[in-house]
Amino acid sequence: MLWLADVLSLLGDQLARVALAVLVFGRTGSALLTGLVYALSFLPALVGGPLLAGLADRLPRRRLMVSCDLARGLVVAVMAAPGAPLWLLCALLVGAVLLTAPFTAARAALLPDVLPDDRYVLASAINNITDQGAQVLGFAVGGGLAAVLGSSMTLGIDAATFVASALLLQLGLAHRPAPSDPKEGTGRPSALRSALAGSRLIGGDARLRALLGYAWLCGFSVVPEGLAAPYAAAEGAGAGTVGLLMAAQPTGAVLGAVLLARFVAPARRLRLMGPLAVLSCAPLLGCALRPGIPITLALLAVSGLGTAFQLAANAAFVQAVPAAVRGQVFGLAQAGIITVQGAAILLAGAVASRLAPALVVAGAGGLGTAAAARLIWSLSRAERAAAQRAGLPG
């Protein structure tokens, strides 16, 4: 039920993103405003992640997830009202994203308890595949729904997915008490103290920092998704093509996750993170040639194939964190992921108001490739240092 509820929520999220991108670009014709509103589906996590993710370590995780789903369903239902002004849509979007932080943290913290040991790694692979599959379906179908039904109806469908997710979690997931940390005694730390403690844990471990850096590479590979509407418009295509452009990378990511989970031994996955991280960004350089929609879709699919490195990085990161603080630490990591995605899309939208969207996508690919090369070196250095401290050969 945890898996199915997550698929429903994610599917609804992608429907909403396509609907909002089409709605804003249709009203304004502005790549900057489209990027700004799309970025609002990521940026509030800068606050919500650090301060609200700790709720997943202080409250029963199932109850927290159900409450967040119901609240998000209500917020998105209001967004679906026809003719809602853009400022109201933006404000409601911020509220919905803030509620995503504790939900995501609770889900990530709960999964290793439901499926411990090696089953967690397999579950991570399945989740990665199904999450990307839900993105493909959500983006591809979302473009068609937005074109046929309109943005308001598409947002209404999104609200229904949150309610369905809440029902599945309440009826199909066993209750578990809130986790406890022996170091904290019977009391609970404040949200600020919890966030600071999680930050210190990450900051004090070079390997965790390097793994987190890999996770944050998505800030470069997400740029084509955020610029899909102006990119399609620059190529003379319509709303249906927007959905295809958004779906291309998740399609490649599904294939990459299947190949990595099925044919690569666990010990080799970490060694492949670097090359795959480079692959997630380097193909975007080809967009500088403005090769047309079909070749662009192929380049984006190859980029998505490379993002399979996130599977190994996520499993290694979560398993290295104590269970009692897993929600907070994962929330901090997720906040960073969402924040860099939103900031990258916002910056890309601003630049795309002056340059061709294809050139902006290519620039993101070049910067991401350089960052991936740096992370290969950083993780290798952290692992050598850890081996030396343990008295093992480097």
Residue ranges and their predicted role:
Residues 1-394:
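Alpha-helical transmembrane-bundle signature of multi-pass membrane transport and export proteins
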